[in-house]
From Swiss-Prot:
Organism from which the protein derives: Clostridium acetobutylicum (strain ATCC 824 / DSM 792 / JCM 1419 / IAM 19013 / LMG 5710 / NBRC 13948 / NRRL B-527 / VKM B-1787 / 2291 / W)
Summary of the function given for this chain in its UniProt record: Catalyzes the reversible interconversion of serine and glycine with tetrahydrofolate (THF) serving as the one-carbon carrier. This reaction serves as the major source of one-carbon groups required for the biosynthesis of purines, thymidylate, methionine, and other important biomolecules. Also exhibits THF-independent aldolase activity toward beta-hydroxyamino acids, producing glycine and aldehydes, via a retro-aldol mechanism.
Family: Belongs to the SHMT family.
Binding residue positions for (6S)-5,6,7,8-tetrahydrofolate: L119, G123, H124, L125, S351, P352, F353
Catalysis performed (reactions): (6R)-5,10-methylene-5,6,7,8-tetrahydrofolate + glycine + H2O = (6S)-5,6,7,8-tetrahydrofolate + L-serine
Residue positions where N6-(pyridoxal phosphate)lysine is found in the record: K228
Name this protein carries in UniProt: Serine hydroxymethyltransferase
One BP term from GO: glycine biosynthetic process from serine
Subunit organization: Homodimer.
Keyword Transferase: yes
Subcellular location: Cytoplasm
Protein's pathway: One-carbon metabolism; tetrahydrofolate interconversion; Amino-acid biosynthesis; glycine biosynthesis; glycine from L-serine: step 1/1
Keywords: Amino-acid biosynthesis, Cytoplasm, One-carbon metabolism, Pyridoxal phosphate, Transferase
Length: 411
């Protein structure tokens, strides 16, 4: 990227940007919800489109001069619909959380019952956490995973739905590493008369590539972010059946937001275009391959992988038998240039600020070119750091930097 202007006009901000660039280039990024966008996506986000206000929708704006930005929003919508084979797409949500909020407010009233996945079992704040708007405005009935398999027990799920008769059932997760049976959930929704909403933010890229069953044929509403496995800009999107299109669009604008971010929508259009290319399927397959090898290697080192493995891009590691908390492991790994995040595990006994586990994912490292052999090295680094936490780890930091230097991101 060309930062010549900001380098001259604001050296303080420029130095921070360069510092973060160096961190990304020299660290192994294992945050499951992060990725590295293409330069094309970045260029779209930094384009002239940022200057245009465009409240409303293409062909029906509240400002003049929108005939150009209308084109980029239409392009983003059409590419999104083609990518996911959806009837309707709204690409205006600023984030996944706002996309979820827009769906709730489109068809629910405060106090209605929502069934959502427990946060400690892998759900998301917006699926009913009591500290989130969703938990404050709606009556939340949480479901979780089996204490035996640490996977969703669909029969227990069904029984709970029959008991509480929710107005909406939300599926999807932020820390669940297994395939979700959307067909089965659709059957349960039909049985209890509930709307079906799927938050596919984490797995959207895998769905687009055909590596995870798509929720689109089954769900009334599907939300997503456009970063994570889609490798696009920070933002959200909503897909729905055509019969709900007007309700969703009204809920996003004027219900939830004012002017859309046209430069981000342009980045989304570029992202969807990239995901429609054949090589994106190869990339997504490598994400999954890397995650599986990573999980297998960590298991060999004695780490316990929640649910026994992974079917997607992430893995949740229970550190209990390693006698270290998620918080301490996060800081320890960060000290050698490996970025992961502390995370609760099913049936968590520690505070969410401490945790018994860490969550790790492979989208970012796959984007920079890591394959199976590199993931084995990363597993070795992690094991060494945890096992030798009281020793000098400077040699591991050096090896991490050397590995990263062979796989530059933007250089």
């Amino acid at each position: 990227m060309d930062f010549e202007n900001i380098k001259v006009s604001d050296s303080e901000v420029y130095s921070i940007i360069e510092e973060e660039n160096a961190r990304q280039e020299n660290n192994i990024e294992l945050i499951a919800s992060e990725n590295f966008t293409s330069k094309a996506v970045m260029e779209a986000m930094g384009s002239y489109l940022t200057n245009k206000y465009a409240e409303g929708y293409p062909g029906k704006r509240y400002y003049g001069g929108c005939y150009v930005v209308d084109k980029v929003e239409e392009l983003a919508r059409e590419r999104a619909k083609k990518l996911f084979k959806a009837e309707h797409a709204n690409v205006q949500p600023h984030s996944g959380s706002q996309a979820n909020m827009a769906v709730y407010f489109a068809v629910l009233k405060p106090g209605d019952t929502i069934m959502g996945m427990n946060l400690t079992d892998g759900g998301h704040l917006t699926h009913g956490s009591p500290v989130n708007f969703s938990g404050k405005l709606f009556n939340i009935i949480a479901y979780g995973v089996s204490d035996e398999t640490e996977q969703i027990d669909y029969e227990a799920f069904r029984k709970k739905a029959l008991e509480c008769k929710p107005k909406m059932i939300v599926s999807g997760a932020s820390a669940y590493s297994r395939i979700i049976d959307f067909k089965k959930i659709r059957e349960i929704c039909d049985e209890v008369g509930a709307y079906m909403m799927v938050d596919m933010a984490h797995i959207a890229g895998l769905v687009a590539a055909g590596l995870h069953p798509s929720p689109i044929p089954y769900a009334d509403f599907v939300t997503t972010t456009t970063h994570k496995t889609l490798r696009g800009p920070r933002g959200g999107a909503i897909f729905c059946k055509e019969k709900y299109a007007k309700d969703i669009d009204k809920s996003v604008f004027p219900g939830m937001q004012g002017g859309p971010l046209m430069h981000i929508i342009a980045g989304k259009a570029v992202c969807f275009g990239e995901a429609l290319k054949d090589d994106f399927k190869d990339y997504a397959q490598q994400i999954v391959n890397n995650a599986k090898v990573f999980a297998d290697e960590l298991t060999k080192y004695g780490f316990r992988i929640v649910s026994g493995g992974t079917d997607n891009h992430l893995l949740l590691v229970d550190l209990t038998n390693k006698n270290i908390t998620g918080k301490d492991a996060e800081h320890l790994l960060d000290s050698v240039g490996i970025t992961a995040n502390k995370n609760t595990i099913p049936f968590e006994k520690k505070s969410p600020f401490i945790t018994s586990g860490i969550r790790m994912g492979t989208p970012s490292v796959t984007t920079r070119g890591f394959k199976e052999e590199e993931m084995k090295k990363v597993a070795y680094f992690i094991n060494y750091v945890i096992e030798h936490r009281d020793e000098d780890l400077s040699e591991i930091r050096k090896q991490v930097s050397e590995l990263c230097s062979g796989f530059p991101i933007y250089k």
